[in-house]
C-alpha cells in the first residue's frame, strides 16, 4: 500500500509511541514485508545534541519504522497495535549523524518473522546519501 500518511493523519494509530517521542512524520509505503517512512529532524527533538540527531535517535527512528509496519499488519488483522521492544541491534553502521532540518528516509524490510519476534534490516538515507544501516531484532508483547 503506497500513500503519504503524515503525523496529523493517524500515525498514532499504527505506533505505540507518543510525543515527544515520535520519530516519524510520514509513512510513505507499508506492506507485510516492509515499511518506508520519513522524519524531518526538529531542533527541539529530545534526542538532538549539538545540532545533530544522536545515534540513539537514528536507532529509534529505525525501530519506529519497524513499529509502523507491525502496527499496519496488526490493524489489517483486526488487532490493536502492540508494544514492541528492541531485543538486539546487529551490525549498526553509520557514516554520519544527521543534522537538524534534514529529512531521514528509512526502509525497514523483514528478513525473518517467527511468532512475535522479527528480524528486520533497516536502511536510512538523507536524500540519496546512505547514512545508516542496521539489523534489529524486535519483539512484541500481547
Regions found by a protein language model. Name each.
Residues 24-25, 89, 119, 133:
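Hydrophobic residues on conserved beta-strands that form the core of alpha/beta folds
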Residues 4, 68-107:
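Hydrophobic beta-strand-centered segment that forms part of the acyl-chain substrate-binding groove
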Residues 8-18, 79-81:
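Short aromatic-glycine motifs in intrinsically disordered, low-complexity regions
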Residues 19-54:
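Catalytic strand-loop segment that frames the active site of acyl-thioester-processing enzymes
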Residues 50-69, 86-87:
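Compact, glycine-rich, soluble single-domain proteins
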Residues 2-6, 12, 25-29:
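N-terminal intrinsically disordered, low-complexity, charge/repeat-rich segments that act as generic
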Residues 36, 68-71, 98-105, 109-142:
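HotDog/MaoC-like acyl-thioester-processing domains
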Amino acid at each position: 500500500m503506497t500513500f503519504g500518511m503524515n503525523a496529523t493523519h493517524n500515525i498514532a494509530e499504527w505506533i505505540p509511541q507518543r510525543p515527544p517521542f515520535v520519530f516519524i512524520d510520514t509513512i510513505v509505503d507499508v506492506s507485510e514485508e516492509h515499511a518506508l517512512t520519513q522524519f524531518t529532524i526538529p531542533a527541539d527533538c529530545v534526542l538532538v545534541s549539538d545540532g545533530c540527531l544522536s545515534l540513539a535517535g537514528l536507532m529509534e527512528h529505525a525501530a519506529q519504522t519497524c513499529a509502523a509496519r507491525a502496527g499496519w499488519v496488526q490493524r489489517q488483522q483486526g488487532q490493536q497495535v502492540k508494544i514492541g521492544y528492541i531485543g538486539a541491534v546487529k551490525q549498526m553502521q553509520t557514516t554520519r549523524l544527521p543534522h537538524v532540518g534534514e529529512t531521514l528516509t528509512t526502509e525497514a524490510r523483514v528478513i525473518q518473522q517467527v511468532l512475535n519476534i522479527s528480524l528486520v534490516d533497516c536502511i536510512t538515507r538523507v536524500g540519496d546519501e546512505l547514512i545508516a544501516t542496521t539489523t534489529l531484532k524486535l519483539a512484541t508483547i500481547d
